[in-house]
């Protein structure tokens, strides 16, 4: 951050602190308006600070993974702390993709830990985070959304999200999808079976096409043309092999 930008942000912060003090002395709608303006001021001060955003994201990422190793209240505290760090990161940089996705993951893990129902607020918050991720980069969190819709038994939304993930090439491997407990409710339904069968056929066709493409680009065999005379054998050049790999003059 340049000195000018730093000075500008400092001035903005001081003005916002004064606005907060004024809000505390006010009442009713006047106070609410001043508080709202102050919050916007704080957000503007924090906005576009890449280093701070990266630090918050990685802090949240560490908390998320530590939470996965804990149980009970300690895990809840760590998940909530991770969620707060990701939210703060996105306050600084609203387009921080990793914070959006992992914020949703943290909400889902917390929902599982607390064994809440699929329509609980925690799952809804996860859904909001995944939708933010998709708005930043289309399809990146479509599979995560499919998992939420799968838990809720929402066929149409789940299928649409799976198709979007497929089209954006963000689906996990088929075996991971089939083993995902979030999709247990829908796995036996005809539409899901048809989707997986079509996916497997597409993968097989893509694999066959890739193999054919590799084979067509493989280097042709080469052979050495050797000219023989009574006294010596001299290698003249290295040439591309003819269509029929049976050169009459090839040295034996």
Label every model-predicted segment.
Residues 1-8, 173-252:
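Terminal, low-structured helical/coil segments at or just beyond the last alpha-helical repeat
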Residues 2-26, 49-69, 95-113, 139-147:
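Amphipathic alpha-helical repeat scaffolds of TPR domains
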Residues 26, 30, 52, 69-73, ...:
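Alpha-solenoid repeat scaffolds
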Residues 28-41, 68-88, 112-131, 154-161:
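Structural signature of tandem alpha-helical TPR/SEL1-like repeats
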Residues 48, 92, 134-136, 168:
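Structural marker of alpha-solenoid helical repeat scaffolds
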Residues 61-62, 100-109, 147-152, 172-198:
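TPR/TPR-like alpha-solenoid helical repeat scaffolds
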Residues 139-169:
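Sterile Alpha Motif
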């Amino acid at each position: 951050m340049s000195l000018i930008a730093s000075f500008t942000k400092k001035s903005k912060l001081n003005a916002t602190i004064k606005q907060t003090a004024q809000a505390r002395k006010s009442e009713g709608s006047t106070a609410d308006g001043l508080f709202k303006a102050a919050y916007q001021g704080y957000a503007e001060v924090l906005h576009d600070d890449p280093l701070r955003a990266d630090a918050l994201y990685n802090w949240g990422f560490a908390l998320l993974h530590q939470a996965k190793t804990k149980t009970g209240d300690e895990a809840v505290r760590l998940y909530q702390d991770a969620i707060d760090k990701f939210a703060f990161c996105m306050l600084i940089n609203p387009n921080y993709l990793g914070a959006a996705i992992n914020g949703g993951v943290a909400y889902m893990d917390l929902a599982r830990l607390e064994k809440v129902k699929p329509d609980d607020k925690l799952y809804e918050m996860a859904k909001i985070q995944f939708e933010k991720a998709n708005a930043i980069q289309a399809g990146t969190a479509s599979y995560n959304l499919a998992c939420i819709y799968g838990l809720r038994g929402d066929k149409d939304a789940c299928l649409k999200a799976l198709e979007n993930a497929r089209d954006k090439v963000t689906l996990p491997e088929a075996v991971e999808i089939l083993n995902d407990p979030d999709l247990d409710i829908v796995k036996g339904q005809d539409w899901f079976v048809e989707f997986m069968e079509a996916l497997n056929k597409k993968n097989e066709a893509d694999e066959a096409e890739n193999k054919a493409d590799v084979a067509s680009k493989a280097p042709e065999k080469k052979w050495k043309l050797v000219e023989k005379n009574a006294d010596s054998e001299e290698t003249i050049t290295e040439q591309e092999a003819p269509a029929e790999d049976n050169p009459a003059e090839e040295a034996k």
